[in-house]
């Protein structure tokens, strides 16, 4: 069974050492409108761009690459 991107990112919450990916995971957790069931890069990328959640989309790209490697 595939994990959604949201589910994958939740393992990065409350990291011992805070970093950009753990901060993104916390922001996703706090955002009740985040598309939690999505596995689609374009849908999640568009959502993050429109929400202004990130200063740089390269943070999402890095997290997405880790997600794809883990699948």
From Swiss-Prot:
SUPFAM superfamilies: YozE-like. Coiled coil: none annotated. InterPro entries: UPF0346, YozE_SAM-like, YozE_SAM-like_sf. Transmembrane segments: none annotated. It comes from the Bacteria. Disulfide bonds: none annotated. Pfam families: YozE_SAM_like. This is UPF0346 protein BA_2302/GBAA_2302/BAS2147.
């Amino acid at each position: 069974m595939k994990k959604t991107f949201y589910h994958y990112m939740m393992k990065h919450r409350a990291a011992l050492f805070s970093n950009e990916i753990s901060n993104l995971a916390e922001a996703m957790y706090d955002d009740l409108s985040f598309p939690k069931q999505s596995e689609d890069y374009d849908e999640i990328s568009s959502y993050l761009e429109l929400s202004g959640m990130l200063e740089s989309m390269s943070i999402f790209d890095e997290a997405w690459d880790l997600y794809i490697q883990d699948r």
